[in-house]
């Protein structure tokens, strides 16, 4: 009798995706992040579901309902802290996953890459609307500031903002619809993840060398299932250490105060994973210019495949491009730091220089380095 996993219509799909999938024999731990992101998504959906059972999306009771979850619901504190810090783990894995894609040239699988960028945008949108739900000071003012950016759009801006708010300010209607968005978006993410995997399995995985690995493939199970479980154990350990020992380390103290439209916090800033984009937004004195730079900082990922000039796919054997890649990494860390600082000197100028360097590295220096490295492979002298 033939094995059921190879004949049953549903099992066959799972078999070709996770068991008998031919995988390159040399992929490193940097290829673990896809599965880790899948686990993050499952954790977020499950903890979120249990939170939604006790949460009320009304301005008068939202803050109290979150306090009630933490105080009175069985293990509510754990579910809430896992959900909040799970988001941080999600973005940590996302940034490393994208960084891996840039370093090893995985972006040349264009469909997979583009779906991945869309996924990044949807996850960012989900995190933003989710941050508003506890209805603390930073939730309220974060929602006010970020939604207000849309008013920079010429002609329709103000109408658009009031349409999203459901009134003339962030209020009950805004909170209710943000809860609805926060509930539906993760399921849209699941659908996009399936499409992401579908396109990936059309081509097979890339590998560190950037060379076609078809001549040497091994089955995904047991080799990479075991390897993924190791990465998973590290991630779960990190998440539990964060959740159980310092659950509020990455949060903002202002969010322990209920939302008050009459009192603005001294420094309005988003969660750490948005700070790099927030720094780019703030570094441009013009409102519309800032919004466009903010969008460009993420959407620039879509044109990275078009900026690939090298004859080699990966950065593994390209020391000049490697140096620029790590400069870009340092640059993003600098932007993240600046995004959390008040708007005063010397932070303003550092932010402006870092923002300019970010675009300069991606748009000009890295493609130029690729061309130079091509020349160095076969110098004309």
Swiss-Prot record:
Binds 2 heme b groups non-covalently. A ubiquinone binds at residue 201. It is found in: Mitochondrion inner membrane. Its main location: mitochondrion. CDD domains: cytochrome_b_C, Cytochrome_b_N. One of its GO terms (biological process) is mitochondrial electron transport, ubiquinol to cytochrome c. Heme b b566 binds at residues 97, 196. Pfam families: Cytochrom_B_C, Cytochrome_B. Heme b b562 binds at residues 83, 182. Its cofactor is heme b. The chain crosses the membrane at residues 33-53, 77-98, 113-133, 178-198, 226-246, 288-308, 320-340, 347-367. It is a multi-pass membrane protein. GO terms for cellular component: mitochondrial inner membrane; respiratory chain complex III. Heme 1 (or BL or b562) is low-potential and absorbs at about 562 nm, and heme 2 (or BH or b566) is high-potential and absorbs at about 566 nm. Component of the ubiquinol-cytochrome c reductase complex (complex III or cytochrome b-c1 complex) that is part of the mitochondrial respiratory chain. The b-c1 complex mediates electron transfer from ubiquinol to cytochrome c. Contributes to the generation of a proton gradient across the mitochondrial membrane that is then used for ATP synthesis. The cytochrome bc1 complex contains 11 subunits: 3 respiratory subunits (MT-CYB, CYC1 and UQCRFS1), 2 core proteins (UQCRC1 and UQCRC2) and 6 low-molecular weight proteins (UQCRH/QCR6, UQCRB/QCR7, UQCRQ/QCR8, UQCR10/QCR9, UQCR11/QCR10 and a cleavage product of UQCRFS1). This cytochrome bc1 complex then forms a dimer. Belongs to the cytochrome b family. This is Cytochrome b. The gene is MT-CYB.
